[in-house]
């Protein structure tokens, strides 16, 4: 009772203190307008410099920041296409209003007590909304301000909030139902390296959400954009010059119901694993023979003893996920120049565990009307992922010029262990598969850029030079296969086969580009803008892999095992007459490749008054791809040298009925080129799908015609409703297919004949103040998409949806934000329709088809909250994936019996639950 009383008194004291503090605060208010036209600017951002406290202007350009502690502040006012103004000395007195009226201008000038900084801010919701509104290409975006309201920890999770986008494997994006290969990604102003060895994709989970200023997704082609996209062109801008000086620290802990405080298993770890750099300690020694098959068994046995023998499995209790970050923002004057720096370092480590059913099937048993397993397995998967990242960006503002030097680095290390057990019906054996794997990924992107304005902003020139590097290192993957007869006896599993595998990939990218803009004014109704630009990009890839197996001779050791192999692979058991490594590497396990892209464009933005705007232009791209490798037999060389030159016209038109209503129309031609890995014949084994993956040197480029129409309604500042439709027609679309290969399955890439996609998108952002809930806002975006792949006459193939395409997707959220008490919360929901993960192979008799594999629909619900305590501290928490719905992959086989009756058989391929994650964290900013 006494404890309850004390807590009640403490609560009442807190309420009293809060009321007292509010009574001792003041207000900053005023109006923001255009300096030339004297018209109010709707949605301008007004922020107290060095803090996150701010508002946007209303329909009359007015703003009001309440509960400001007495003192002197700098206030930053920004708006898209206007120069930011920082009012340095705004004095706030308790219970009084400090009035600040600001006129924003395009001109580079200096006003009394106002420092004009030529830096556009795009990190606020209003800034992104206005960028989308004023852009001629069809696009959507999200700001760092909106990201902060969610529990999203990386760029992949953030992208789910953008209309028309879904996520595959927690890191790859699907735009408008089109698979990740149809997207292009730039980090700031240059291309990103592919982070995967076996697909054309960028892994968005390497980008922490805290480093993102804004993300824009362009959905229609435009001359200044690269032509190699049909789904979306994604540009991620990292944080840059700040308004003031600040430091911030963040810590977050995450509890996962599958893993945290549960028994966990991994092979023995290295000290460098703690920072994600564990790959180096697992690589082959420098004195390794060039090929073991060229040496004697005695030499091979000696080498076998030399390489690491970390086969032991360590059992421990998994800790909750840990995330730490530090950020420093610096802004200062250097003479007449303004210098800014954003430095950030982040670290995270976490554990994941799931139990998965994993199946493959033979042809359907028509006699017994039943599915027949080929393999029926159950997996236990353990994974520890560590990420270390850094951002180091500099900006220099000097008169009419701006210079930026941006650097992004990420290191990711993943240690995993999979124990698979079940029945192999093909060989009629009980089997166990065991895989221990460590992967290291290194990503770096560096860019130096400049922007220069001339002749009172009539001419603008910008340029960028960039370098990117990606390393994927998979050292010492260990696979062990054990078996026993399925007779129900207690006979132990016996090791039948063991393998070790090493691979490393290095990508280097060099880029340079420039854009020029010239404004003309013919009369008051016609003010065209002429654009032109050049872009060059050169990429290289070096890939090398080595495969090893074990010769197991003699009987002087125990090959029986129960998920523990350290007793078998010991130095005592290794020798020329016992156990030693043999090499299975051939010439097809290595390849080199490079490509060059040279592009140029011209376009014109044409207008008729303020109502009609059009951007008309053409882009030309020269592309050269070279590859040197071998066919899977390691004998026949593969030497490719392919060049294409293509024109890509585009037209983007917008018509403004008034300041609230707008209609867009767009057409553009684009290309989808095969990536390095998709054309090289190298074969890689995917353990999760227990199948080989190989490329196809005969792949052709796919071309697409893209048409968009979208109506946009802007009810008030910060609100939007848009409804759009789109059509995409493809020639030679590239898809991943699979086919039977002996007793297993092999995946590869193929061109279909043609395909098309037709869809509708709806996006709504609405404040709920019209029903008296002024602190609540509602967000909804969804899409309905129909796609079909067509095949030539006489083909066994039957028309079906495009690979990776969802027939519908839904993202919706409810946001609460009260600036007076510093409390915010959100509820976010996501669902996708079923989509083809892998294309099957049809047969002449449909009953014998290898069906397509579908990822099934899944509901995802996230909750989050944050509470500010004073000016410096913020508490955050949330629940991720509250519903913990199964992630499921199914096949659907249409069967016709001899009597002509047809039924659809549902066959489970893979299924598991990822677990619910509860997060709580604290941030301190000063």
Please name every model-derived segment.
Residues 493, 505, 509-515, 694-700, ...:
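Outer membrane beta-barrel strand-and-loop segments of large Gram-negative receptors
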Residues 27, 303-418, 444-448, 651:
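Transmembrane beta-barrel wall of Gram-negative outer-membrane proteins
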Residues 33, 37, 44-47, 78-82, ...:
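Short, acidic, small-residue-rich periplasmic hinge/interaction motif at the N-terminus
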Residues 51-62:
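Short, acidic Ser/Thr/Gly-rich low-complexity loop/linker segments typical of extracellular
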Residues 831-843, 867-926:
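C-terminal beta-signal and adjacent terminal beta-strands/loops
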Residues 191, 420, 473-474, 563-582, ...:
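Surface-exposed extracellular loop regions of Gram-negative outer-membrane beta-barrel proteins
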Residues 726-729, 748-839:
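Gram-negative outer-membrane beta-barrel transporters
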Residues 91, 120-122, 126-174, 189-206, ...:
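Periplasmic N-terminal accessory/gating domains of Gram-negative outer-membrane beta-barrel systems
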